[in-house]
Amino acid sequence: MSFRIAGPRLLLLGLQLFAKAWSYNLDTRPTQSFLAQAGRHFGYQVLQIEDGVVVGAPGEGDNTGGLYHCRTSSEFCQPVSLHGSNHTSKYLGMTLATDAAKGSLLACDPGLSRTCDQNTYLSGLCYLFPQSLEGPMLQNRPAYQECMKGKVDLVFLFDGSQSLDRKDFEKILEFMKDVMRKLSNTSYQFAAVQFSTDCRTEFTFLDYVKQNKNPDVLLGSVQPMFLLTNTFRAINYVVAHVFKEESGARPDATKVLVIITDGEASDKGNISAAHDITRYIIGIGKHFVSVQKQKTLHIFASEPVEEFVKILDTFEKLKDLFTDLQRRIYAIEGTNRQDLTSFNMELSSSGISADLSKGHAVVGAVGAKDWAGGFLDLREDLQGATFVGQEPLTSDVRGGYLGYTVAWMTSRSSRPLLAAGAPRYQHVGQVLLFQAPEAGGRWNQTQKIEGTQIGSYFGGELCSVDLDQDGEAELLLIGAPLFFGEQRGGRVFTYQRRQSLFEMVSELQGDPGYPLGRFGAAITALTDINGDRLTDVAVGAPLEEQGAVYIFNGKPGGLSPQPSQRIQGAQVFPGIRWFGRSIHGVKDLGGDRLADVVVGAEGRVVVLSSRPVVDVVTELSFSPEEIPVHEVECSYSAREEQKHGVKLKACFRIKPLTPQFQGRLLANLSYTLQLDGHRMRSRGLFPDGSHELSGNTSITPDKSCLDFHFHFPICIQDLISPINVSLNFSLLEEEGTPRDQKVGRAMQPILRPSIHTVTKEIPFEKNCGEDKKCEANLTLSSPARSGPLRLMSSASLAVEWTLSNSGEDAYWVRLDLDFPRGLSFRKVEMLQPHSRMPVSCEELTEGSSLLTKTLKCNVSSPIFKAGQEVSLQVMFNTLLNSSWEDFVELNGTVHCENENSSLQEDNSAATHIPVLYPVNILTKEQENSTLYISFTPKGPKTQQVQHVYQVRIQPSAYDHNMPTLEALVGVPWPHSEDPITYTWSVQTDPLVTCHSEDLKRPSSEAEQPCLPGVQFRCPIVFRREILIQVTGTVELSKEIKASSTLSLCSSLSVSFNSSKHFHLYGSKASEAQVLVKVDLIHEKEMLHVYVLSGIGGLVLLFLIFLALYKVGFFKRNLKEKMEADGGVPNGSPPEDTDPLAVPGEETKDMGCLEPLRESDKD
């Protein structure tokens, strides 16, 4: 099988963006790069050979292209000599192909141009080099088209009628002279005939040759005829007299007649004799303004008339008509049949693509057959060429560019196939597969694969892949570098061989965010670079920022859809552009027996080294192999058994995956150990208290081990599932270049891209006896009846359950409770043996019935030990607007993972709880009730006592279940020794009939003075408010012998069936009483008491007056003494002193003025 590199055929522009990169076994630190003084297209194609790299550098501007040989011993490349070549190659290096079997190299220049009769022909020039590159062995120009100058005999038939003035006639002559001058160096022959009423030959073909093609001599003495315009007659005249051999006409020349006139024909007739003459008519002047007048010229023109009729409004425009006339003539040159293509191999561009396989060379020829394209099958000497194209050659295949890319598809059991791309076919592109012929046979088209997106350039790049390297190409990769979708530019379609046809199996894409990235502009099959014995593929995307290369690893049956590595151009060389425009990687260039990959860029070629791929074999072991239960379980005893933890040993060794590499390997391993890494809380801890431990160690192909230790927190709940120990590892990168590592040092490998995590579990020790098989025996019990459920907004229900295990340890014990939908789970708590034992419940939303719900509780998760008994309490809230029966029934069932079905008879229990509905009744006495009366001997003997009670029934959610209510009014019974008697009556609003009954008197009335003796029973009608009036008549029936106070009590209570209902706010809220205080006043005779008291008071007053007189109280002269002393006794101010008087002035007693003395007047 050959290996070819077909890079992008367009000169690509670069972008400067940023991209991420993945790292696998292609080292992004370039081993070497090559340069040459060959312009920016150096690197357009790259190809590895035995001792280096061949680089193609097509020319740009006035520069020629060339080939360069780059050796690893030097950074600069030398031109490849083209000894014996006498051609200048403008685009040499655009196409390179190599023969893997023979080592020969084919290089082509598809742009060998030359001029033929003022037309430019394009064909190819190919060189076949030996493996040593010492000059080309062979060279050839495949599909070279010799310049076959077309012979054309052209007659000017010009109008000389009287409608022309002299100036316009001269302009017609100048136009003919100009055409003759410009085509003088061609195979054209000219003749001229003037027509009016008659015809006149101005010069024949013979005259044209004799006069040395001089138009000034031939037309210098022509004079206008100035008569009618007999056009029919003139055309027949030319056929009969000018297109004749005796006039110099050539039998093998194309006959062209150019008619110039300024008016419509004056005569009639037919021109059938001119059917084999191409007729081009030019109408000039204002006579042909209307469309109808223009149509009069159509009869003289060839078909299609739109192409062969030209209307000019002035004669001055004749001088600009030559280009159009030349194009019309050139389109028919060399052929008289319009059903053939205009171009055959003149513009073939042969060599735009090439491939070699076992000495069999093919080159693409996109310009053949009017750009329909095809390819050329070359002999080994490059001298013979057989053109193969798409047949039949219809209009829809023109412009398809078949042969833009070619690729051999090798086969072991049959003749090989050749894939040829036509990226412009019907604007969507297609790829045709042909089967190579046997000796002397024909190529057969076997399959057509069409693109789907307009403008995607589907087939612009082809690559055949021998996946398992057995000589059979299993995959065909078709590039569409202009494909657009999902913000990605470019796509590669993978087709797999299925018997005789190829079917698409996958698509390869680049990174999003590069709509113009040209992913798939270069595709190449590498050797096995990752050591899995499958061919890998590299895809170039030269316009993703500075360019990028993707590596897709082979896998059984195809290619991995995701790249194992993306190498950015900026990552390799800052400032590089178009990185990935060409790629090749099949040989070792560094001497380490690992294939290196060569990547072309703008003006530079980069060599990327492969690194040896290894795997790391790891082993984990524990001591002890099981975790003792005493290390992790909760302990409530004073003495705890000593805990030692677990020892962990981790061993590593390198396992090479690239056996061709024979050097030394040394790797620096980074590892991370995790204990229960998948849990929120780890059950194992390293000495530093963390569940994670990291470190580095050096490893080699020899086994090396590390020792670790971990312990456990107290009270681990999950003692069933083993502890997961995970070891995650990677290789650390070292600084330096790949070449540094190859110079006498151990090679740093790369780790295989797989899951680099090893996990191992260490189980917990099981207490299951000698057979190591635990068999549990669970029992569930609950009180048959519990306290009632009182329905209210904040009501709750607590149910106690007892669970015991008389067998061995039970695993994952679960208690399932079925309860009515009127209840909602609130909480669960452990009562016995202690609250630290774990229990959790969850109300299930699925699996419940219409009437009941299910609660799932995990008890003592995960182990319920042998002989253990627990009591737990489950609490529920009630839901409003629920329907209830007389009893609530709860059914419980206990399960575990290791109980025999024959022991599950006692795993269920049920409890029944009575339901009480709320009654919200409030009673209170009214303010207008009688609270006090009194009796005197002289007062009335009879008084009325009135007690008024209000009964309010508050609405509730359970009014529909309201019980029968009865008001009980209690009134006292008179004592026999009391001086008063009383009678009672009860009335209600709304009015009902009340019945009275005597109550049994207690033995001791003194202790219960308000105990009723008579009770009235009044049925209550359900209303929001009810008034009950108790009226008593109290009569003084005996004489009041002494004053005393008595109490009369009436009471009210509301009764109902307490077995189904309860007072919402307690029974006291529906009870009330009124206490009446009765005073009995005994009146006595008090007149003599009053008289004696008055006399005693007067006597006492007289005695006091007499005593004061005897002591001289009324004869004292204290005032005079004070005035004589001028002071105040005891330092106190005089009584008449004004405290507000001005000092130094005498204060006068304004209430006791003395007479004015004479001495005071001065």
UniProtKB/Swiss-Prot annotation:
GO terms under cellular component: cell-cell junction; external side of plasma membrane; immunological synapse; integrin complex
SMART domains xref list: Int_alpha, VWA
Domain of life: Eukaryota
Domain notes per entry: The integrin I-domain (insert) is a VWFA domain. Integrins with I-domains do not undergo protease cleavage. The I-domain is necessary and sufficient for interaction with ICAM1 and F11R.
Binding site for Ca(2+) 2: D528, N530, D532, D536
Family matches, as InterPro entries: FG-GAP, Int_alpha_beta-p, Integrin_alpha, Integrin_alpha_C_CS, Integrin_alpha_Ig-like_1, Integrin_alpha_Ig-like_2, Integrin_alpha_N, Integrin_dom_sf
Binding site for Ca(2+) 1: D466, D468, D470, E474
Localization per record: Cell membrane
Pfam (any one): VWA
Keyword Nuclease part of the UniProt annotation: no
Protein name, per record: Integrin alpha-L
Transmembrane residue ranges: 1089-1109
Organism placement in taxonomy: Eukaryota, Metazoa, Chordata, Craniata, Vertebrata
Domain VWFA intervals: 153-325
Glycosylation site residues: 86, 185, 270, 444, 668, 696, 724, 728, 777, 858, 881, 891, 900, 928, 1057
Function, in words: Integrin ITGAL/ITGB2 is a receptor for ICAM1, ICAM2, ICAM3 and ICAM4. Integrin ITGAL/ITGB2 is a receptor for F11R. Integrin ITGAL/ITGB2 is a receptor for the secreted form of ubiquitin-like protein ISG15; the interaction is mediated by ITGAL. Involved in a variety of immune phenomena including leukocyte-endothelial cell interaction, cytotoxic T-cell mediated killing, and antibody dependent killing by granulocytes and monocytes. Contributes to natural killer cell cytotoxicity. Involved in leukocyte adhesion and transmigration of leukocytes including T-cells and neutrophils.
Topological type in the membrane: Single-pass type I membrane protein
Oligomer status and interactors: Heterodimer of an alpha and a beta subunit. The ITGAL alpha subunit associates with the ITGB2 beta subunit. Interacts with THBD. Interacts with CD226.
Secretion signal span: 1-23
